[in-house]
């Protein structure tokens, strides 16, 4: 009998030791970075990702919003979690999120998204430009770690802040999507929360695949970043330009004196075939009303130009693309061509390069045919820029198509953008991150 008791005691101690060691290992593990796979939806051209959220964990599909303020999800339908916690008025969470001192009240039984004495924000569908009020809350989020080259173990943030949206906000988003993942310049965006929780640098990189059948990637944390076949991108592989803060929010709804969470860069001029395009350069600056300038966006599928800039760029491009037959326009594009006489290169159709000249003549973002020309039918290629109208809020919006197969690093601590131009030159693509090999 004594022998049996001893055996049970030994087994119990062993089990406790294993459990304790496992828990300690999970607690002490600090990932170098994190990754999110990104897919391109063929119907909407939105860039989608997926996280695991709640308890028990469930997969949540989201539209990627580079300049979005935070993670928001639909809490009206099917949100069930034992670890959901609404943020109470005047709490540290509300202060961190910039939610102000107002207190929300709910006039129905408590549930996720509807609790008394909570603070709220304004979840924004940036595709349809629709916003509403929503409850700030925290819950468990699980994502995969990475060393910049391979995926690693899954890690959890048990107090990840997000905002509850309403079901009607999902209108216009891709099928199956339950919210939006905001990577913008706020203290509760995904990059900010991940870097704070896991103590890695406040940097993230975006590499969007041009294919609807292959995954691109967002990498949170510092580089180097590696793509197959062993193409490494370190700090000296990037060109750098400052990121600017627009002092006036560009969200659909916002509070006074709230700056924009989107990423603006300082384009000084535009060149085609290394020749300056004559444009009104005052449009390239942000005025005191927050109008003008250049931003980068993943919710706009194509680059959008203010009308006078669009006309100048289109006309100049047509003039430089000699001996190519122009054909009828195909909406939303104006300048379309017979592609049968346009040669192919490693970086797409052989057409004039377009340069966004940045802080000086030696720093420019060169756009090649793969990112400027859209194949709209078998024999028709169109210049993939869109007329944004006479008085848009932002003069140039660099859209998703233009940044596909470009590696962009957003350094939040130093407020700068690192960019590579097309990585097709390096004989790789954004679809070549090795998601299959576990670090």
From Swiss-Prot:
GO terms for molecular function: aspartic-type endopeptidase activity. It comes from the Eukaryota. Keywords: Apoplast, Aspartyl protease, Glycoprotein, Hydrolase, Plant defense, Protease, Secreted, Signal. Glycans are attached at residues 116, 280, 323, 434. GO terms for biological process: defense response; proteolysis. One of its GO terms (cellular component) is apoplast. Residues 47-420 form the Peptidase A1 domain. Its main location: secreted. Gene3D superfamilies: Acid Proteases. It is found in: Secreted, Extracellular space, Apoplast. Its EC number is 3.4.23.-. It is an enzyme of class 3 (hydrolase). Involved in plant defense against Phytophtora parasitica. Contributes positively to Nicotiana resistance against P.parasitica. Binds the P.parasitica xyloglucanase XEG1 and inhibits its cell wall degrading enzyme activity and its contribution as P.parasitica virulence factor. XEG1 acts as an important virulence factor during P.parasitica infection but also acts as a pathogen-associated molecular pattern (PAMP) in Nictotiana species, where it can trigger defense responses including cell death. Belongs to the peptidase A1 family. Interacts with the Phytophtora parasitica xyloglucanase XEG1 and xyloglucanase-like XLP1. Possesses stronger binding affinity with XLP1, a truncated paralog of P.parasitica XEG1 which has no enzyme activity. This is Probable aspartic proteinase GIP2. It comes from Nicotiana benthamiana. The lineage of its organism: Eukaryota, Viridiplantae, Streptophyta, Embryophyta, Tracheophyta.
């Amino acid at each position: 009998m004594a022998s049996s008791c001893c055996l049970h005691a030994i087994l119990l101690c062993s089990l406790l030791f294993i459990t304790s060691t496992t828990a300690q290992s999970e607690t002490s593990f600090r990932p170098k970075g994190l990754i999110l796979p990104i897919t391109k939806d063929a119907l909407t051209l939105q860039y989608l990702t997926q996280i695991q959220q709640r308890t028990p964990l469930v997969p949540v599909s989201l539209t990627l919003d580079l300049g979005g303020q935070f993670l928001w999800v639909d809490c009206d339908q099917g949100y069930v979690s034992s670890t959901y916690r609404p943020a109470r008025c005047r709490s540290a969470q509300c202060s961190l999120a910039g939610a102000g001192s107002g207190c929300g009240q709910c006039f129905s039984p408590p549930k996720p998204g509807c609790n008394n004495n909570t603070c709220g924000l304004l979840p924004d569908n940036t595709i349809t430009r629709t916003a509403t009020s929503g409850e700030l809350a925290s819950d468990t989020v699980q994502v995969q770690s990475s060393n910049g080259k391979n995926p690693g173990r899954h890690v959890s943030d048990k107090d990840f802040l997000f905002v509850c949206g309403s079901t009607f906000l999902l209108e216009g988003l891709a099928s199956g999507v339950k919210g939006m993942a905001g990577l913008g310049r706020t203290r509760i965006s995904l990059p900010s929360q991940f870097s704070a929780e896991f103590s890695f640098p406040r940097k993230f990189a975006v590499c969007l695949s041009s294919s609807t059948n292959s995954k691109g990637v967002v990498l949170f944390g510092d580089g180097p970043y590696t793509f197959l076949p062993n193409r490494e991108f370190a700090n000296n592989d990037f060109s750098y330009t400052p990121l600017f803060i627009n002092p006036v929010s560009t969200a659909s709804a916002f509070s006074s004196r709230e700056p924009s969470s989107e990423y603006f860069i300082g384009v000084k001029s535009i060149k085609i075939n290394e020749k300056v395009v004559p444009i009104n350069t005052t449009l390239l600056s942000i005025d005191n009303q927050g109008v003008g300038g250049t931003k980068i966006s993943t919710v706009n599928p194509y680059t959008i130009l203010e009308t006078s800039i669009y006309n100048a760029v289109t006309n100049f491009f047509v003039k430089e693309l000699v001996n190519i037959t122009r054909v009828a326009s195909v909406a939303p594009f104006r300048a379309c061509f017979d592609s049968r006489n346009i040669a192919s290169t490693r970086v797409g159709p052989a057409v004039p390069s377009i340069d966004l000249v940045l802080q000086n003549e030696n720093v420019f973002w060169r756009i090649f045919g793969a990112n400027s020309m859209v194949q709209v039918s078998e024999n028709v290629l169109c210049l993939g820029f869109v007329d944004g109208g006479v008085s848009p809020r932002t003069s140039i919006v660099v859209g998703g198509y233009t940044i596909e197969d470009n590696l962009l690093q957003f350094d939040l601590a130093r407020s700068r953008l690192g960019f590579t131009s097309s990585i097709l030159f390096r004989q790789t693509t954004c679809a070549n991150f090795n998601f299959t090999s576990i670090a």
